[in-house]
Amino acid sequence: MLLSVEQVTKSYGDRVLLDGVSFYLERGDKVGIIGVNGAGKSTLLRLLAGAEEPDGGTVRLDPGVRMEYLPQNPVFQGERTVLEQVLLGLNDADRSLAEYEARTILNRLGVSRFEQSVGNLSGGERRRVALAAVLARPCDVLILDEPTNHLDNDMVLWLEDYLRAWKGALVMVTHDRYFLERIVGRMAEVEDGRLFTYEGNYDKYLERKAARLESERASERKRQAILRREYQWVMQGPTARGTKSRERLERYEALKAQSGPAEKSTLELNARASRLGKKTIECTGVTKGFGGRTVVRDFDCMLLRDDRIGIVGANGSGKS
C-alpha cells in the first residue's frame, strides 16, 4: 500500500469538513474524488499530499514513495524560467531524465518559451507550467486538483491519453465527467463529512450510489415502522421495573435518537424572469480586440430560449 488514511478529521472553525474518513491507495490505482462544491474535496487532497495536517487520525505515506501534487492555485517563488521551475529540486540524475520529458509536455500544453520568466506568465500559463512540472518529475503518486482547468480541448484529450497510459497511482478532483469516465477505476465521494468509495468508473458510481441510497431509504422506512410500533407501546405507559420493559424502553430511546438520511445538496438553476418570445440574445456584426489584436470579428449569433451552446477553441482564441 502506497498511502493510507485512517479516521481523519478536519475542521475549519465550527465547520467539520471531514469526519472519520479512511482511504487507501495501491500501486496502479486511479481514483476520482467527487462531491458538491465545498464538500471538502480539495481539503482531502491537501491532506493526502501533506500540504495540511489533519485535526485527528493519520495520513501515512510509505517510506520511499515519491509524490507530486498539483494544487488549484500554484504559487511560484522568485523569477525562475519556465524550464527551471519545472525541474526545480531535482537531483542531477533525475534532472537529466526529466528535461526532455518536460520540454515535450510543455509543448503539448501550449508553453513553448522555456526561458520566459514565470513571473510574466498569465494565470492559465502558470497552471499549465505547474501541471507540466508534476507530470515530468519521476514519482509514484500523482495528486491532481482540477488538472483540466485552463486546457483547451486538444490539451485535455492529450492529458487523458497520458494519464490512461501512466503506470503510477493517481488521485484527482475534476468536474469533467467524461475525463473521469475514461481514466479512473475507483470513485470516492465526499458527502456530509464522510467518504463513500465505489469500485468502477463514473457510470458504475452512478449505479452503485443509487443502490446505496435506496438501501438507506429502505432502512429508514424500517426504522420508522418500528418507531411507530414502539411509540404505541410507550403510550400505553409500561413500567420500567421489569428487565425486559427497561431494555425495550432503552431501545426505543436509542432508535428515536438516530437520524435518518440527510437531505442531499443539489445544484438548482432557476430562471425566474419571464420573457416575451423565444429570442433572448442577438448579436450582429460584433467585433472586439485588445491592444491591436482582434479576437472577434463580424460575429453574428442568435440565442433562443432553452438553447444549450458550448464554446470551444484554443487558448487565447477569444472564448471568454
Can you say where each PLM-predicted feature lies in the sequence?
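Intracellular alpha-helical coupling/juxtamembrane segments of multi-pass membrane proteins
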Residues: R208-R251, L255-A262
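ABC ATP-binding cassette signature C-motif
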Residues: M1-R221, S265, L269-S320
